[in-house]
Design a protein with these regions (language model features):
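Terminal, non-catalytic protein-protein interaction segments that mediate quaternary/complex assembly
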Residues: 1-288
Length: 288
């Protein structure tokens, strides 16, 4: 993960100071790329603690096609939503978006239901009646050398209805002749300190799950950035992180998965980072 730290350092030293939607302010740089070979280990950040259960629960939630933040809480905390009404204790990274932008858009918002509109999971599983995940898997099986293996969340017609428009916009999958599945993801807006380590782990996990279903080996995850930025309320935290020495990457242990539908039979505890060791957590506020 040294290349991630190098990019953090570059933005700290060379990023331009800009205003932003959240009124927090950022140091920003445009157009970068990182590449991780999953054969070298799972790309989990080690220079601070990764919120792994948060990564797994959000991806499983996306793959369900849900638009309800409280469903994410059920997956994350493994309780029914009626047991999760203490929001100080059982919030998720999407709670603030539901309570702010979701409410502004007029969506249902209570202790047990928090709608977000047609966000990632809805687009992945039901874009105008199209299940992109199933079509992606079918395409990779029937025509592995094809160049149309695309997964997109940027539904122009629905952007204004989303509590948060997609930051990770589109990904393309590629099957090598050596039987490895790779993925390149384009992220239009990247919170380099808080969000990007989470995004790297999430797409590496998605790649691993799809490879497992297809009986392929995971190959490279290529992360391409548009606006890569560090919020000004996390500059000192980023400076601390780049002083830390990366540790050995862990190995992903996961169950054998035959189909996307099989995921409902597993919990977040079935996805384990074996050998994961990290430096202590570094906390920073999330800009909403």
């Amino acid at each position: 993960m040294k290349q991630y730290l190098d990019l953090l350092k570059d933005i700290l030293e060379n990023g331009e100071s800009r205003d932003d939607r959240t009124e927090t302010g950022v140091l920003s740089s445009f157009g970068h790329q990182l590449r991780f070979n999953l054969q070298d280990g799972f790309p989990a950040v080690t220079t601070k603690k990764l919120a792994w259960k948060g990564v797994v629960s959000e991806l499983l939630w996306f793959l369900e096609g849900s638009d309800d933040e409280r469903r994410l809480a059920e997956i994350r905390f493994q309780k029914s939503r009626e047991e999760l009404t203490d929001l100080e204790k059982f919030s998720t990274i999407w709670t603030d978006n539901a309570d702010n932008q979701g409410v502004e858009l007029g969506y249902a918002n209570s202790e047990t239901v928090k709608k977000l509109g047609p966000i990632y999971g809805v687009q992945w599983r039901d874009w105008g009646g199209k299940d992109q995940i199933q079509e992606l898997l079918e395409g990779l099986r029937s025509n592995p050398l094809g160049r149309r293996h695309i997964l997109s969340a940027w539904n122009v017609e629905k952007i204004g209805e989303m509590a948060l428009p997609p930051c990770h916009v589109m990904s393309q999958f590629y099957v090598s002749t050596n039987g490895r599945l790779s993925c390149q993801m384009y992220q239009r807006s990247a919170d380099m300190f808080l969000g990007v380590p989470f995004n790297i782990a999430s797409y590496a996990l998605l790649l691993s799950i799809l490879a497992n279903i297809l009986n392929l080996e995971p190959g490279d995850f290529v992360h391409t950035f548009g606006d890569a930025h560090i919020y000004k309320n996390s500059i000192e935290q980023a400076k601390e992180q780049i002083t830390r020495e990366p540790k050995k990457l862990p190995t992903l242990i996961m169950p054998n998965i035959e189909s996307i539908e099989d995921l409902k039979n597993f919990s977040i505890d079935d996805f384990v980072l074996d050998g994961y060791e990290s430096h202590p957590a570094i906390k920073a506020p999330m800009a909403v």
